[in-house]
Structure formats: structure tokens, C-alpha cells
Regions:
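Hydrophobic packing and interface segments
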Residues: 1-697
């Protein structure tokens, strides 16, 4: 039974379909919640319309990119089309396009539910914190269940229909490339609006957040959806697919060597159980009448983790799977939780780092920036150690199994860490839903009590969002280490037909080709981040000029005349146009750099390139995500009445810190882990070409 991979494929498909049915039930539950406030309904439709318009335009641009990429893939991958059988190239192209479609669907599903749940959550807060929390959480869970169900279904179908792991890498590349551009575009949109709204509204005019007089306020709320919902959904979809693809590449290679299909079966078994555990975790998630939303979200994550550990242990025993592989996957899962806890410590407004940055803000914005940068760098150490220990422990646990099992252990550690991604996405999507709900409550005049409730929910969302971003980056770290193993596996398979080829087991950093690749690879995340943040910079300056124009030219707007409304659509247009203009160059730079390094230095240079890219990318991603979350929550801590409260000099300094942190945590930081995955997949897909056609090989 343990060698019957088709059994576990069938189970995976069944569990995927169950997750879709559960997502539909959750969607209908949210839709049934009462909503009667006319002002909230009107503003909610503006947000929904803006988000759908942006997504349509973004996907139109990305469809052109995907079409061009599909032509190149057909011509050159897995080998030039004129050299032999054309069928593998057709299969690879279809797999790539399927990956882009699944990834795009993840973003679209997220937008649809988030722009319904935000209105329902705002009005539910009139009944208390419990119903409002459940509405926001279940709205996020629709996306969690749909995205992970799509992942498992997509990988299962590609594996079953093609019986080819290279096609899985093509599917993963499709998901990753679209996720890279979607995350970059959404991040530029959301932070353009957020920075502009904060600088003009809070710093210059001293008006509250989400004040309807601010022309950028609707664009800001649209940005929460296109960046934090659609972008993060595509991002975690991509990480999950990549971890399974890397594990299956090595599993199939091992199965060929030892006979049977036990290792492939293990990957599908654990992935299906992870989704089942997330379904149970979401279904049982509750918060007491006067409970703490942060505690409720974290408790659901811990429950899901425990369910996965128990069920996989039972499956390993019952089906006679390898216990060492189970150990590797559990290590990955536990380290994921630890990375989340570390991110929580540095970003939670009840912990010392946030208080220290708030205290520093009393002395001015320079000290806000300095303290935030310092704590951001310190926060990288626990996560980097965690990723390193997870990889090392998984490697050593599986080493006695021999052959390629140590690297397979690392791949399964990544699968384990991402096993509860259904719950992680649910928690992550909850954040922007309740953030929108808070804005709608203020614009809909629901009163101070409702604002207090939505502030509490929003604070929990910010804390959990920092945790989920740390988790996503940690998972990407293990995934790309596994993809490095998959790259070596692909190179050795391609080299087997070349006379005199010596199989690769590792890379020597004293080899100048490896060192060349390492230096270039390490620089890419920094340049990539800079390009995205400069995009936000340029776009925000255009929007700030537009906001100034409206306050200057529209009579009664600044004074709050109830009969005067800003031209919200102008700011949405600026954010959309700028994001679409800026989203392609950074991603294209990363992909082209990989290809150039490969053709110049060969597979040795690519090995160094990936190593440098992984280390520097993880460090920067963790630093930016945690520093940005720290500045954001320090500002909110001051706004809650500490260190002088709203309007104080400390508050103005904290707003400056938050403005710097916004593109850190919501544009560049979360996009880096997708960039690392994309270049790793490009390397694996083009390994044959790099092996035979490099300049200095």
C-alpha cells in the first residue's frame, strides 16, 4: 500500500474537493451576515470596484508576459524544439500556463471574498467583538481553503497526467512568475496609497486615518486588498507548489533508484493531511465573547499544528512509511511556528521592541528610524538560525537512509512547514479584511465603541500578519534549499547522457565560477528591493501632488463640508497606472540575471548564484518585514494613548517611521521570497542548456 502513489493521489484530489466545498460554505455564511448601512455599502462598492479594476488591468499585462514566456518555453524547454521530440516542450508549455491560471485564480478568489467580508465585519462589530471576529476570520478562511485546495489539486493533476517531474517545475514556475509580478504590483499600489494618505492626512493636516475627506482613502483600502490579499495569496500558493514540486523531483529520483513509489506517496500523503488539518482548524476556530483576537488566531494555528503532527504519525505507522521522513517534516513545522513566535516578539505592541521604538520617537524621526532598523536586523537572527537548524536537522535525520535522502529530508521539512498553510493564509487574509472594516466603520459613522472593537481586531491582524510573513519567508527559505537540491538532481540527470560528465554533489566556493555566481546572486535581492521601493517613491510623489491639488482646488473639502466629496477615482488611477508601469522591470531583472549568469559561468556559477541569492534574500526579507511591522505597531501603540498619543511630536515621528516601513513590509520584503523561488525554478528548468551552452564551462 505504501508504494501505491495513485491511492494518495486520489486522496489528495478528494481532500482538495472537500476544501472547495468548505470554502463555498464559508463564503455563503459570510454573505448571509446582515448589512444595512447605506454609506458602508456605497464605500464598500467603491473599494470592490477599484480592486477589481486594478486586478483586471494587472492580469491583462501579466497575460501578455505569460504569453511571451510560453512561446520561449515552447521553443527552448526542456530542450530546443528543433533538436528532437516536440511533445515534452508542449507539455512543459501547458504546465506553465496552468500554473499561471491557478495563481491568478488564487488572487481573484481572495479579492471577491475580502471585498464582501470587509463590509459584513464592520457592521457585525455593532453586535460585539465576537461576531465581528468570526466574520473577518471566516472571510479570510475562504481564501485559505480555496488556495490550498487549488495547490494540491493542481500538483496532483499535473503529476498524474504527465508523469513527469520537469512538468511540475514548469507548473511551479508559472505559479511563481505570476505571483512575483502580482505581489510586486499589488505592493506598489497599496503602499503608494498608504504613504500618500498618511503623509498628507496625518502629518500635514492632522486628520484621522480613514477620514473620508482624504482623496487617497479609498485607494488605500483598495490597496489592502490587491496587495495583502491577492498578492499574498498568490505568494503562498507559489511557495506551497514549489515545496511540493522540489520534494517530488527528488522523490521520483529516489523511487527510481530503490524501486516502488513510497517517497512520492509520502509527499502526497502529508500534503493531503496538512490540508485536512487546516480544514479542521478553521472549522473549530472560535473566540470567546470578550476574548482576545490575537490569542484566538494563534490558538487555531497551534491546534492545526498538533492535528497535523498526530495524523501524519498515524498515517506513517499505518501505511508503513519512513519515520525519519516524518521527523524531518515535523521539524520544519515546528521551526515555522518558532519563526512566527520570533516575528511576533519583535512586532507585537505588548512586547519591549515596539515600546522602545515608541520611546525613541519622542526624540524625533531620526531615532525612530535608527531604532527600527536596529531591531529589524536583530530580528533576523532567530529566524535564520531556525531555518539553518531545520535544514541541518532534516539532513542529519535522513542521512542514515543514504543516497539522496538527506536533501529529500530538507524538501520534506519545507513540505512540513507549509503543511498548515491553509490556516496561515486564513490568518493572513483576516488582516486586510479587518483593516478595511475599521476604515468602513469610521467612514460609515458607526461610533466610538465600534471603532474600538475594529481597532482591536486590526491590531491583532497586524501582529498576525507579521507572524505569517515571517512564516512565509521561513518556508521559502527551506523551499529554495530544496530547489537547490532539485537543481542538482536535474543537472545530474541531464549530464548522464554526456560523455565524461562527473555527477555534482555540491559546489566549491574556491571555484571562481561559483564565487562569481555567489557575488552576483547576493546582490540581486538588494537591487530588486530598491527597484520596487523606487517605484513606490515615484508613484507616491505623483499621488501626493494630486491630493494637494484636490485640497487646494475643491472648495469645502478641507473644511469637511458634508456636501463635498473628493475625487477618489483620480488617486485610484494614479496608483493603478504607476503599479502597472513599475511591476515588470524588477522581476524581469531577476530572471534575466539568472539566465545571463548561467550562460556565462555554467551550472557551477548557477550553484553559487542560488546560494548567494538565498542567504542575502532571506536576510533582507526578514529584516524588511519585521522592521516594517515594528514601525507600524509602534505608531499604533502611540495612537492608543501612549508616549503623548495622537497629534504629539512622538506620533508624527512614528508616522514617518511607518511611512518608511510600509514599502519594507508590504512591497519589497514579501516579494523577495518569491524572487528567490523564481530564480531557483528558472535555474532548474534551464539546467540542460546551462550544462551544454555556457561561455566558460
Amino acid at each position: 500500500m505504501k508504494n501505491n502513489v495513485n491511492l494518495f493521489l486520489a486522496v489528495s484530489v478528494i481532500v482538495s474537493l472537500c476544501s472547495f466545498l468548505f470554502a463555498v460554505w464559508l463564503y455563503k455564511w459570510v454573505e448571509r451576515q446582515p448589512s444595512s448601512n447605506v454609506q458602508i455599502a456605497r464605500i464598500g462598492e467603491l473599494i470592490r470596484g477599484g480592486a477589481n479594476t486594478f486586478l483586471k488591468k494587472e492580469y491583462t499585462v501579466l497575460a501578455k508576459f505569460a504569453g511571451a514566456a510560453a512561446v520561449l518555453i515552447f521553443l527552448f524547454l526542456p530542450s530546443p524544439v528543433w533538436t528532437g521530440n516536440v511533445i515534452p516542450n508542449i507539455i512543459m508549455t501547458i504546465s506553465y500556463l496552468a500554473g499561471t491560471v491557478f495563481s491568478a485564480a488564487a488572487g481573484k478568489i481572495g479579492i471577491q471574498i475580502a471585498t464582501i467580508a470587509n463590509k459584513k465585519t464592520a457592521e457585525a462589530a455593532q453586535k460585539g467583538i465576537q461576531p465581528s471576529f468570526m466574520c473577518g476570520f471566516r472571510g479570510g478562511a475562504v481564501m485559505g481553503m480555496a488556495v490550498v485546495g487549488s495547490t494540491l489539486l493542481g500538483v496532483s493533476l499535473v503529476f498524474f497526467l504527465t508523469n513527469n517531474t520537469t512538468s511540475l517545475l514548469g507548473f511551479s514556475f508559472g505559479a511563481s512568475s505570476l505571483a512575483l509580478f502580482a505581489k510586486a504590483g499589488g505592493g506598489i499600489f497599496t503602499k503608494t496609497a498608504d504613504i500618500s494618505a498618511d503623509l498628507v492626512g496625518k502629518v500635514e493636516l492632522g486628520i484621522p486615518e480613514d477620514d473620508p475627506r482624504n482623496p487617497a482613502v479609498i485607494a488605500d483600502n483598495v490597496g489592502d486588498n490587491v496587495g495583502d490579499v491577492a498578492g499574498m495569496g498568490a505568494d503562498l500558493f507559489d511557495s506551497n507548489v514549489a515545496s511540493m514540486a522540489a520534494a517530488l523531483v527528488m522523490a521520483v529520483s529516489l523511487d527510481k533508484a530503490v524501486g516502488g513509489s513510497q517517497n512520492s506517496a509520502t509527499v502526497f500523503c502529508y500534503a493531503a493531511i496538512g490540508l485536512l488539518a487546516s480544514i479542521i482548524g478553521v472549522a473549530t476556530a472560535r473566540m470567546g465573547k470578550n476574548g482576545n483576537p490575537t490569542r484566538a488566531l494563534n490558538s487555531s494555528t497551534y491546534v492545526t499544528t498538533a492535528i497535523f503532527a498526530v495524523l501524519t504519525a498515524l498515517a506513517t505507522w499505518f501505511f508503513g512509511l519512513e519515520w525519519r521522513i516524518w521527523g524531518a517534516s515535523i521539524i520544519g513545522l515546528l521551526v515555522g511556528v518558532v519563526i512566527g513566535i520570533a516575528s511576533d516578539y519583535f512586532t507585537d505592541d505588548t512586547k519591549p521592541p515596539v515600546h522602545q521604538v515608541a520611546n525613541a520617537s519622542e526624540t524625533g524621526p531620526a531615532f525612530t528610524i535608527l531604532s527600527g532598523v536596529s531591531y529589524g536586523f536583530i530580528s533576523t537572527l532567530p529566524a535564520m538560525i531556525g531555518i539553518g537548524i531545520s535544514a541541518l536537522a532534516a539532513y542529519k535525520i535522513c542521512e542514515p537512509l543514504g543516497g539522496g535522502y538527506p536533501m529529500f529530508g530538507i524538501a520534506m521539512s519545507a513540505v512540513g512547514m507549509l503543511s498548515i498553510v491553509g490556516m496561515i493564509i486564513s490568518n493572513d487574509a483576516y488582516g486586510p479584511i479587518v483593516d478595511n472594516a475599521r476604515g468602513l466603520a469610521e467612514m460609515g459613522d458607526l461610533g466610538d465603541e465600534v471603532l474600538d472593537i475594529t481597532d482591536s481586531l486590526d491590531s491583532a491582524g497586524n501582529t498576525v500578519k507579521a507572524v505569517t510573513k515571517g512564516f512565509a519567508i521561513g518556508a521559502a527559505g527551506l523551499t529554495v534549499i530544496a530547489l537547490l537540491g532539485a537543481f542538482i538532481s536535474e543537472v545530474n540527470e541531464a549530464g548522464a547522457s554526456i560523455a565524461g560528465f562527473v555527477p555534482i554533489t555540491g559546489f566549491d566556493i574556491m571555484n571562481p565560477a561559483v564565487f562569481f555566481g555567489m557575488l552576483v546572486g547576493a546582490s540581486i535581492p538588494a537591487v530588486f528591493s530598491a527597484m520596487l521601493m523606487l517605484g513606490v517613491d515615484r508613484n507616491a510623489q505623483r499621488m501626493i501632488a494630486e491630493i494637494h491639488r484636490q485640497f487646494r482646488e475643491i472648495a469645502g473639502l478641507k473644511e469637511g463640508d458634508p456636501n463635498v466629496e473628493p475625487e477618489y477615482d483620480k488617486c485610484i488611477e494614479i496608483a493603478t497606472h504607476g503599479a502597472l508601469k513599475e511591476l515588470i522591470p524588477a522581476g524581469l531583472m531577476a530572471i534575466l540575471s539568472t539566465i545571463i549568469v548561467g550562460f556565462v559561468g555554467g551550472v557551477e556559477a548557477i550553484g553559487g548564484f542560488l546560494t548567494g541569492n538565498i542567504v542575502s534574500g532571506l536576510l533582507l526579507a526578514l529584516f524588511m518585514s519585521n522592521a516594517g511591522g515594528l514601525w507600524d505597531n509602534s505608531k499604533k501603540f502611540i495612537e492608543s494613548g501612549h508616549n503623548g498619543g495622537k497629534g504629539s511630536s512622538a506620533h508624527k515621528a512614528a508616522v514617518v517611521g511607518d511611512t518608511v516601513g510600509d514599502p519594507f513590509k508590504d512591497t519589497a520584503g514579501p516579494s523577495i521570497n518569491t524572487q528567490i523561488t523564481v530564480v531557483s525554478l528558472v535555474s532548474s528548468l534551464m539546467s540542460t542548456l546551462f550544462l551544454t551552452m555556457s561561455l566558460f564551462h
